[in-house]
Amino acid sequence: MSSFGTARLLISNGGEVALELTVEPWAETHRMLPEQTWAIVTHSPAADGPWSGTLRGDEPFQVDHQPGSVTVWVNGNCFHLSDTEENAIDSADWHCPAQVASS
């Protein structure tokens, strides 16, 4: 049993051109090609949250869309970014717990 809460958000680019994905508050920017789907995973120190929220309390994520870009505000204490096969897109060490592949 883990001692932290985990939240997962899938982001897909269903358009015909690349999108800029920015993960805040780290200002990490990545280019998502058309038809790509990525997972953003974050962790909270407590097993059931709480998440600080951006506009409303207890929300692990906030998503803002602008033409050509998507910004995801992560309200946990770290994040992992991977594709749908759990291959790391951002391998930076954000002091997150090790990811365990799901079966």
Task: Describe the function of each predicted region.
Residues 13-15, 34, 66:
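Short loop/turn positions at the edges of beta-strands in beta-sheet-rich folds
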Residues 1-2, 103:
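Basic/polar N-terminal segments that are highly enriched at the extreme N-terminus
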Residues 16-23:
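Short, structured beta-strand/loop micro-motifs enriched in basic residues and often containing a Trp
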Residues 43-103:
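Terminal connector regions
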Residues 3-15:
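Asparagine-centered strand-capping/turn motif at beta-strand->loop junctions
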Residues 3-5, 24-26, 57, 66:
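Residues that act as N-cap/strand-start positions at coil-to-secondary-structure junctions
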Residues 18, 38, 69-70:
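Histidine-centered metal-chelating micro-motifs
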Residues 24-47:
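Intrinsically disordered, low-complexity Pro/Gly/Ser/Thr-rich segments with frequent PxxP/GP/PP motifs
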